[in-house]
Amino acid sequence: LGAMHAWEEAHERYERLFDAHPQVIACDMHPEYLASKWAREYAHEHGLPLIEVQHHHAHIASVLGENELHGPVIGIALDGTGYGMDGAIWGGEILVATRRDFERFWHLPSFALPGGAAAILNPERTAYALLKAYSELNDAFFGQFALDNPQFAPFLERLENRALLDQMIDKGLNTPMCSSAGRLFDAVSALLGICAHPGYDGEAACLLEASAWHGCEGGHPLTARTFHEGLAGAIIEQA
């Protein structure tokens, strides 16, 4: 709320200093963003046209504008949370876009986000939901990530409210579907024990990146070219 009040004061000061009067109002299409609520109210009060823009299209359109391009282009938008056209949480998107419109060409396969926004500060929930989903796949590759893998025993031992999480995921209670790359990074960070209780949105992913930079050199060899379509998208399987 403090940030919102600061924005309102800055907006009023800007209009007064520069005698600026907007003719069109644009905002994120998210129904609950404070800035979007402000934009809708302002447009209504002043009789101005309102343009609501999808979050990830806005990212790509801004890059087009900065580079004086009109498109179409293939744009990749990877972030934490953005309200999708279908009402789901987007965040791992490949869009074919112009400045005016876009087509959602591909996205990270959706996974459960137990607790919705609460999972941002509790990424262990998301990690558990992913492992639970992998466990239900009859697939040799994804079987490596099943809940019965002994490597995940320490994670499961420290996980709280597992029975409640099972109910939420199985029944879809306050558990929206999500295609967010940021939430996926959060889950991996929690699963590895790097950051299970972040203090702010994105901290778990940032600490995961920091750990990766200080990790050992090397890689995981992939020799086959078998693509999996489904929960984990197009993943090249090791022969």
Residue positions per predicted region:
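Short acidic/glycine-rich loops and adjacent helix/strand connectors
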Residues: 1-239
